[in-house]
Structure formats: C-alpha cells, structure tokens
C-alpha cells in the first residue's frame, strides 16, 4: 500500500509517476487506486459541492492515474444523488463511491466501509476470493472499546506537549491499552520543564497511579 498526497508541488510528482508506472507494469487486478477527497458545503447552507472532487480527478487523469474507488469526506450525509453525479463526471461506478463518516472511535471506520460494501468491491476489483471470517473480531473489539465505563487518569510528561501530534503514537498506545482493559483514558499533558523537586508533588496530584509524594 502506498499513500500519496495530491499537491501542486514538485516533491509529490515522482511518487505519482511511480504509482502510474506500477499500474502500467502490473496486471489490472493487482493494482488499485483509491482517491480520498473532500466534499465541502457551501458556506451558510448544507449544499454539497462536487467540483473539488471533479477537479482532483482531472488532475490525476492528467498524470495518467485513473482512480478505481472514491472515498468522500464530508460532515454532511453524502446522498445517492451526489454519488451519481460523481459517478457521471468521474467515470466510476456508484458502488465504488463510499463516504468516510463521522464516528465516535476511529476503529469504527472499517465497519462503516464494510456497511457500504467497500470490502466486497475491493475483492471484486482485485479478483480475490477470500472466505468470510467465522467471527467478527474487529466488531467485537469496537463493541468492547465503546462499552468501557471505568475512568483512568494518566499524565503524559514531555518537552513538546503543546504539540500533541509529537506524542500521538504514545497517546494512542495508552488509549488502546486502556480500552482493552475496560477503561476510558483522561489524558493530561504535563510540560516537563514545569516539574521540579518543589513542584512535582503538586503537579502530579489527581492521577490514578500511586505516588511516592
């Protein structure tokens, strides 16, 4: 799997050319292009605009890349009329157009895609014949995560806590471990420079772990 962000700068062009060549050098059932695109609303109304999607499609086509699947991102519900419009102007079947819906947990996104038939369409396009799983372990995991009731407060100490993305993998690991144990995490960010011998006990009050203070 290769992810490439479509931008109008020279840095991304070699990657786009590389995936074009990958498609050209392999059988059609071995390569699949998925285009993720924003479907914005008109300010002051809920009207969805498909022009940005049509424009990005034409940009890709000009580079020799034809998307097989469209994943649409919008805060509003993508109606069948919108899908048909994109299908018409972007030359892709309606069943190849799905919405990335707003969900409570990011782990619900695959379930949302399954409900919309994305998994079956991918199997069809790649000519794969895979057996249905006997047990839906992913759905069971999401149900377990969402049913977590107990709360645990964890402090994450770092030098760059103002930029939460700098510790995103650590934060996600803590949340995943807590979910699996039946807990929800109240994550607090602690700036390491503010921790001194005089302030450490005060700063670390209220956390779930035992303290030596």
Positions of PLM-derived features:
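N-terminal beta1-alpha1 cap of cysteine-dependent amidohydrolase-like domains
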Residues: 1-213
């Amino acid at each position: 799997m290769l992810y490439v962000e479509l931008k109008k700068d020279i840095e991304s062009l070699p990657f786009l050319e590389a995936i074009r060549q990958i498609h050209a050098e392999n059988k059609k059932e071995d390569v699949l292009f998925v285009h993720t695109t924003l479907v914005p609303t008109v300010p002051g109304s809920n009207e969805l605009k498909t022009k940005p999607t049509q424009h990005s499609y034409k940009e890709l086509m000009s580079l020799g890349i034809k998307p097989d699947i469209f994943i649409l991102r919008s805060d509003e519900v993508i109606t069948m009329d919108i899908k048909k419009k994109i299908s018409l102007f972007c030359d892709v079947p309606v069943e190849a157009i799905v919405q990335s819906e707003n969900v409570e947990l990011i782990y619900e996104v695959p379930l949302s895609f399954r409900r919309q038939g994305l998994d079956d369409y991918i199997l069809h396009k790649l000519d794969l014949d895979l057996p249905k799983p006997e047990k839906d372990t992913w759905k069971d995991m999401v149900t377990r995560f969402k049913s977590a009731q107990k709360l645990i407060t964890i402090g994450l100490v770092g030098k760059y806590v103002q930029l939460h993305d700098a510790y995103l993998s650590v934060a996600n690991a803590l949340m995943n471990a807590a979910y699996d144990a039946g807990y929800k995490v109240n994550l607090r960010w602690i700036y390491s420079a503010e921790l001194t011998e005089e302030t450490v006990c005060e700063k670390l009050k209220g956390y779930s772990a035992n303290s030596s203070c």
